[in-house]
Amino acid sequence: MNNSINHKFHHISRAEYQELLAVSRGDAVADYIIDNVSILDLINGGEISGPIVIKGRYIAGVGAEYTDAPALQRIDAHGATAVPGFIDAHLHIESSMMTPVTFETATLPRGLTTVICDPHEIVNVMGEAGFAWFARCAEQARQNQYLQVSSCVPALEGCDVNGASFTLEQMLAWRDHPQVTGLAEMMDYPGVISGQNALLDKLDAFRHLTLDGHCPGLGGKELNAYIAAGIENCHESYQLEEGRRKLQLGMSLMIREGSAARNLNALAPLINEFNSPQCMLCTDDRNPWEIAHEGHIDALIRRLIEQHNVPLHVAYRVASWSTARHFGLNHLGLLAPGKQADIVLLSDARKVTVQQVLVKGEPIDAQTLQAEESAKLAQSAPPYGNTIARQPVSASDFALQFTPGKRYRVIDVIHNELITHSHSSVYSENGFERNDVCFIAVLERYGQRLAPACGLLGGFGLNEGALAATVSHDSHNIVVIGRSAEEMALAVNQVIQDGGGLCVVRNGQVQSHLPLPIAGLMSTDTAQSLAEQIDALKAAARECGPLPDEPFIQMAFLSLPVIPALKLTSQGLFDGEKFAFTTLEVTE
């Protein structure tokens, strides 16, 4: 928990204080009063009856003593339950393929009033210019969009080619920005544990802020050392005992339920009345189709209540107050005097049915957000421009030679998990002994002219066709999987032609593709249009076989070397447990 930075975010002038106190005392007129409402008590459990009184951006008072208080406007909640605005503790907005402006339009009406985002996807492609754009978007957003300064660009030095660096000097230039809450996920955990000075310099520079972690499956002395370095949280836990041990050692636990990594069922049993202040909810990576059809943090709260019997006040606590306290955002997370008036009115608290949202004391209208979207996006000056410095490819670029009787390494996918297993398969004249093995390749897209790095993939479920994408964590090179070199080349050439994007090929033809013109990561289409296009892509992909629920998001993590066990980067096959490159052929 980091309270040392609260002064940075809770800006309120003396004049605002005097106006707020006057309304609290009953000596002045409120801007809004919400009547006919019950407030969920996140501290004690139960409910508080009575109005919510708002002056400016802040709550002036709560309770029956304000029943007859005067207001410029009154909001009839019709018996709704009021809870604090939801907070996502860790996400990459780019992974939604929406701009920050469009993301706000899609998620704010669902009660997501605050996000803590790490824009390291666009920073890996465009460097500091990408971070600066996110900051501009955050400055003009109604949603509270806070930024963690990306710490590992690239994710792991010397393991991949990416588009830009983000030096400590550049990072420090953003440290005191009003939207910055700390240092984003420190993914090079072996480097931290071994005491690499370059990494410790980053931790020292941001130690007065919040230091985000990333340590999937870590335990023992290594976990102790990582926490001893000052790391405060982790969103990568996927096993119950792993999460429990991290909590025991004082680390805060971000329980993640994204579109590919789905850890809520495994970790939800940990949440209780005692440790809930140390537990938070996050999505990390969630696509627009799921946001439109299932929700965002609201979907996670709903599952905690309905599937895991988490008490109401505890479920909403981990979705708001716990995260606010952890990041030192003490003006957020509670419906109490002096707190920012980020309020979600629920017609059904158990089903998380959002009736109305207020942020910074103002009611939110979804149609107004949509109407403002184009102008706000233009005002933010998005970093347009082709970031694909790659010539078209041919089938021969993906040719691999195999020797009968030899054994070859296979990246083995676990559906709906980011980790993979490292298996092997023997090749014969009839092919591999495993019939689920297909091909995977990663092509750098930043003008280095490297030959494609090629490998084998099992368990993905691809029976025919090919999928290609420029969303490929964290360097965002071109990743392609396929059953034939010809279709792989066709898919890759389509995303090159689009200036970045996603593509499905089957029967020798492009079945569906989605251009992503901003950094090869984001679309400028509306959330609804983007969700429809994702739906078409998924439908086309399902014709290729029994793929993961979110095939493109799952595929995007097959090149991320900081998550075990076997991955493929633009420079070759990488052992994510030994943190070293390895060979396709098994020789030992």
UniProtKB/Swiss-Prot annotation:
Keywords of this entry: Hydrolase, Manganese
This protein's record includes keyword Manganese: yes
Class of the enzyme per the UniProt entry, highest EC level: hydrolase
Gene3D superfamilies the UniProt entry points to: Metal-dependent hydrolases, Urease, subunit C, domain 1
Catalytic activity field: adenine + H2O + H(+) = hypoxanthine + NH4(+)
GO biological process, one term: adenine catabolic process
NCBIfam families per record: ade, PRK10027.1
Subunit (UniProt): Homodimer.
Family membership: Belongs to the metallo-dependent hydrolases superfamily. Adenine deaminase family.
Protein name in the entry: Adenine deaminase
Natural source organism: Escherichia coli O157:H7
Gene: ade
